[in-house]
Amino acid sequence: MTEVRCVLAPNPGPMTLEGTNTWVLRADVASRAVVVDPGPLHEAHLDAVSAAAGEVAVVLLTHGHADHSAGAEVFAERHGCSVRALDPAHRLGSEGLGDGDVVAVDGLEVCVVATPGHTADSLSFVVAAERAVLTGDTVLGRGTAVVAHPDGHLGAYLDSLRRLRDLAESAQVERIWPGHGPAIESALPVIEGYLAHRAERLDQVREAVASGATTPRAVVERVYADVDPVLWPAAEQSVAAQLVYLSGWG
């Protein structure tokens, strides 16, 4: 059994939903915890994570976006532990993270799965004992993830979704613990929905381009007309990634 706690950061918004989920994991009755995505540099939030975690063995980052990583160094220094991430710029200590790595702490095992696409450095973490995967921003608790050009790469993202789907189809993963939004108890239909949504959006972008839309903004005005305009700048970056993909470069 694994003790699992989610500490919600006070950073709600259109892109972060209710806020960033910081996950605290430990093997049942173990003394040391693994903390995934300490979140923003917000003192009260880091205090809440510390209270939930107790002794911390290591901090893991799903990716380097500030809403997940900005508080990591301060938090890790407070607990005297390392920060492990794919991108060396976000590490504290000499150990990184890569596909296939297993982080083992006092009976808890966290398996690293490379899931690039939302960002080049995106990772997911499988907790096999719970048949769960922590997905960061690759799959959210509600809505869909943004794949924003230039760091976002749609081809890689689709491959990552297929890899997560394979884990769900093989019953290695049944639930999703996301970086934002509520936990998902049935992973497979959500991942399949993400893939279907991306295919539908790509068809819509193709149609918009065929009908004369020549810029990301023009495509957004046609394809994302039902989306709150406050999200259009992010949608433009997403469309840019889709156009790169459709051009054969992404």
Whereabouts are the PLM-identified features?
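Divalent-metal (often Zn2+) His-rich catalytic cores of metallo-beta-lactamase-fold enzymes
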Residues: 155-212
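Divalent metal-coordination and catalytic microenvironments
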Residues: 3, 25, 37, 63, ...
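Active-site environment of divalent metal-dependent phosphoester hydrolases
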Residues: 42-43, 64-70, 90-91, 120-122, ...
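C-terminal regulatory/interaction regions
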Residues: 207-250
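Surface-exposed cleft-lining segments at the edges of enzyme active sites
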Residues: 143-151
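Generic beta-sheet signal
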Residues: 84-88, 136, 179
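Conserved beta-strand hairpin/beta-sheet module of binuclear metal-dependent hydrolase folds
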Residues: 1-52, 124-136, 141
